[in-house]
């Protein structure tokens, strides 16, 4: 039978063939794995004390690098804490490996400490159960989300491991090819690009509604224009969906009323498309009148947003506009769920030359700080010779920030600015049905959830540089001040949510 140190050494060598970064958490049962990983020169090891944060850190690293990243934990509830990140990874097709240490079979069902049934704990992925070195040979890394459960018996460690032998790294291609579809450009075609979208050859000149995490299109169309396109006189005759759009109700409603072709490189196909592919062959020519209609509709909507911004006080929408205006080519942006990613879409994102990431798989707010840190760390590691790493900015709401404030703990990147749009609660609910006047008596307790937390005190407790902005000019100044200086910064933008419902109404065309 393989000893635990030998098995851990084999697991570490296997991981080294497929990953550059590993996040470890302190624990006894996973101690042989941690020691072997630290002993390797070909793996960057990050340490976090909270498994939930660790898994989201790994997810952020994976999003940015587009490579597998592993998180390694001890047994028991430590494993369960990785579930939210595993779910997001599965639904966003992000490569993530969860390595859980486990008790040997003889201890299961005996009431042994920190012993739960870990095989199959993540229903989004099957478990590769490893009890011997030979079990590693059957693990396929040609998939996005992987759970490796390693049974380790005592003695867990013997001597401090020597430096592991270098291995040849393998880069798996994890894509599904759905073939080619034919598109007739003589039709009024509109592209809707969501998360996981890519630049599709042949569609460069087609008008495109692009969500912030999609590539910046050559002919962008403002998302509010979907309301205009609902009129039958100018309704698109065909919509091409690239990736996974989720943000705007009007866009999703339009998709339900027009023939749709879906372009994807994954095995996930939603809706009821008339065709599915991964590449296109185009025929015909774009109608210049259709191009002009799309341009005019987009301009009308962009002007409406500017008009509304000028007519209302400092809100999260203003914060998103300030962030957009101060991003530069080469910067990276991570957008929190809920209002920030939608606000970013309304103020003109995506941006050319700026990498933009957002958690749009399961679209939860959890783990946002940790994911942003992971993205920034990957950006920082891209060029070890650079005097200063390219800047990463993260935009999120106050509740999202507080939900993952523990993500501030641990080794930090030196190139990250977190912008917190603080409206003292859950501003997105102001714009939904539950924010209507008849629900106000119960709104604050159940949905608004004001907290009154002093974010400056949090920054001080974690040793993070803090700036505060109560007006749009102050925010722009703070963003500019942090552009040319290395470090980890938190900018708190003190906003209001009292006008969000009025703003949403004003943006309904």
UniProtKB/Swiss-Prot annotation:
Pfam families attached to this UniProt entry: TPP_enzyme_C (PF02775), TPP_enzyme_N (PF02776)
Note describing how the cofactor binds: Binds 1 thiamine pyrophosphate per subunit.
Gene name in the database record: menD
Swiss-Prot/TrEMBL cofactor(s): Mg(2+); Mn(2+); thiamine diphosphate
Family: Belongs to the TPP enzyme family. MenD subfamily.
Pathway: Quinol/quinone metabolism; 1,4-dihydroxy-2-naphthoate biosynthesis; 1,4-dihydroxy-2-naphthoate from chorismate: step 2/7; Quinol/quinone metabolism; menaquinone biosynthesis
SUPFAM superfamilies named in the record: Thiamin diphosphate-binding fold (THDP-binding)
Assembly behavior: Homodimer.
Organism superkingdom: Bacteria
EC number: 2.2.1.9
Organism: Corynebacterium diphtheriae (strain ATCC 700971 / NCTC 13129 / Biotype gravis)
Protein's recorded name: 2-succinyl-5-enolpyruvyl-6-hydroxy-3-cyclohexene-1-carboxylate synthase
Primary role: Catalyzes the thiamine diphosphate-dependent decarboxylation of 2-oxoglutarate and the subsequent addition of the resulting succinic semialdehyde-thiamine pyrophosphate anion to isochorismate to yield 2-succinyl-5-enolpyruvyl-6-hydroxy-3-cyclohexene-1-carboxylate (SEPHCHC).
GO biological process assignments: menaquinone biosynthetic process
Record's catalysed reaction(s): isochorismate + 2-oxoglutarate + H(+) = 5-enolpyruvoyl-6-hydroxy-2-succinyl-cyclohex-3-ene-1-carboxylate + CO2
GO MF, any single term: manganese ion binding
Keyword annotations of the record: Magnesium, Manganese, Menaquinone biosynthesis, Metal-binding, Thiamine pyrophosphate, Transferase
InterPro entries, per database record: MenaQ_synth_MenD, THDP-binding, Thiamin_PyroP_enz_TPP-bd_dom, TPP_enzyme_TPP-bd
CDD domains with a match to the protein in the record: TPP_PYR_MenD (cd07037), TPP_SHCHC_synthase (cd02009)
